[in-house]
Structure formats: C-alpha cells, structure tokens
Amino acid sequence: MTDLNTPESTSKPVWEHFDHVEPGIRRRIAVADPEIKEYLDGMLARIASHRGVEHPFLNAYRTTALDPEQERHLFSECYYFFRYLPFYITGMAVKTRDEMILREIILNVADEVGSDPTHSTLFADFLARIGIDKEHLDGYQPLEVTRQLNDGIRHLYTETSINKALGALYADETMSSIMVSKINDGLRNQGYDDDLRHFWQLHIDVEVGHSNSVFNAIAPYVGSKAARAEFEEGVFEFLGLVERYWDGVRELVGIGK
C-alpha cells in the first residue's frame, strides 16, 4: 500500500510514490522529453502541497476522534462529494478523438464500476457499518459548498476544453490519493479495524494509479505554454473548489480550526 502520510514517505519527492507503484496499479508511460515529466512532476508537487489537500481539517482528523454526530456530518458530506464523479469523468470522453485519452478515462471509470462489488457499493457498505443508511442520506441536506463542489466538478469535466478537464482530473486523482490516506488514518485513530476501512485502504493505491492514467493522457499535450495554461486552470479551479468544501466541513464538524 502506497501510504503518503508516513514520516518515511515525506522524506522523498512526492512524485516517486507515483513512479514506483504496487503490482496491478496503473503505471506512468515513459516520456521521451524529460522536461515534460519534470513539468508534470512539478505540478503534482504543487497539487500535493495545496491547502485543499493539506487542509487543516484533514490533518486534524488524522489524530482527533469524532463523536457520532460529527462523524455522520463528515461522511454524509463525503457521500454528496463522491457519488456522481464516475459519470462526470465519463463525460470527458466526448471532448476527444484521441484513443490514448479515451483509454485512460475508461480505465479510471472501470476501476470504479467495472467489477462487483462496485466502489460505490463498497462505500455504501462502509457508511452502513458506521450507522449512515440510505434513508438518512436521502433526507440529508448537504452544505452549499458541497453542492458548489459537485456542480463545479461536473462543469470542469463536461463543459470545458479537454486540456482543462484533464488538469482538473489530475488534481482530483492526485488529491484523492492523499485525502483517502488521511481519512484512513482518522478512521484508524477512531478505532476502526482494517475490514471496516477497506474502502479507504483500497483507494490509497487506486487513486495513485488514476493519477498516473491522467499523466499518460496529458503528457503528449503539455509541450506548449498555451496548453499548460489551460491545464493549470483546470488544476487550480478544482483545488479551489475542494479547499472551500473542506472549509465548510471544518465549520460543520468543528475541528481543525
């Protein structure tokens, strides 16, 4: 498992965790121009250090136990964050006629829904085991920042250029690999065992592979300043949405201030 939050892991550049992955995890393609890899590695490091990723709430949650109400709020908001993402990612496919990009998009979505149980089913099982059932979720009103996050991601993936959409997805998948590791730490601190935390542990490596898929898709297209500007717009618009989301969750749950 590629844990990005251990002291050992922080002693080396973050992109090394993406260059050297566990068997069965999507690997990066070899890039002929070393400057392209250096650029994408640098963007990965900028994503990893962004406040939306190194958020005070997430860092506090790693070592702060929540009461049942706080826990319900946190994971109900996560449900409304995650639930439609595979559909939005699939919508990116109509923007391109490049089979490499199409393949990488399909591989990411296939990880989520291509086998039984699907990852959304695993997440629903996790929620049920901590006392959050479908009836609760159907009646739950998420924060406005959570609605804005969902709408913003849908817009980025389905209504912007392919370069900008891939920038957002690179930020999404890279951020997610770190976020799920922090949440897994918090759940472990809460006293939950490996079996209950399976969804989160699974995604630590899965999201690294998903980030690598986006690396493979975008690498041929970030040679120019104009393409990089579009790509970076997507990266930082996505991270801004996530930062505001965690700010809202922090206020709701009441830790990490």
From Swiss-Prot:
Per the UniProt entry, the Enzyme Commission number(s) are 1.14.99.-
Its domain of life? Answer: Bacteria
- What is written in the cofactor note of this entry? Binds 2 Fe(2+) ions per subunit.
Which biological process annotations from GO are given for this protein?
Answer: antibiotic biosynthetic process; L-beta-ethynylserine biosynthetic process; L-propargylglycine biosynthetic process
What did gene disruption experiments reveal? Cells lacking this gene no longer produce detectable amounts of L-propargylglycine and L-beta-ethynylserine, that are terminal alkyne-containing amino acids produced by wild-type S.cattleya.
**Which InterPro entries would you find in this protein's record?**
Alkyne_AA_Synthase, Haem_Oase-like_multi-hlx, PqqC-like
Q: Name one Pfam family in it.
A: Haem_oxygenas_2
Cofactor(s) needed: Fe(2+)
Could you say which residues bind Fe cation 2 here? 112, 173, 207, 210
Name the top EC class. Answer: oxidoreductase
Q: Annotated Gene Ontology MF terms?
A: 4-chloro-allylglycine synthase activity; metal ion binding
Q: List the disulfide bonds.
A: none
Per UniProt, the keywords (alphabetical) are: Amino-acid biosynthesis, Antibiotic biosynthesis, Iron, Metal-binding, Oxidoreductase, Plasmid
Q: Which residues bind Fe cation 1?
A: 112, 119, 203
Quickly give the catalysed reaction: 4-chloro-L-lysine + AH2 + O2 = L-2-amino-4-chloropent-4-enoate + formaldehyde + A + NH4(+) + H2O
Its pathway, per UniProt, is: Amino-acid metabolism; Antibiotic biosynthesis
Q: What does this protein do?
A: Involved in the biosynthesis of terminal alkyne-containing amino acids such as L-propargylglycine (Pra) and L-beta-ethynylserine, that are produced as antibiotics by S.cattleya. Catalyzes an oxidative C-C bond cleavage in 4-chloro-L-lysine to form 4-chloro-allyl-L-glycine (also named L-2-amino-4-chloropent-4-enoate), with release of formaldehyde and ammonia. Is also able to react with L-lysine directly to produce allylglycine in vitro.
Task: Name the NCBIfam families on file.
Answer: ChlAlygly_Syn_BesC
Query: What's the protein name?
Result: 4-chloro-allylglycine synthase
**What organism is recorded for this protein?**
Streptantibioticus cattleyicolor (strain ATCC 35852 / DSM 46488 / JCM 4925 / NBRC 14057 / NRRL 8057) (Streptomyces cattleya)
Gene name of the encoded protein:
besC
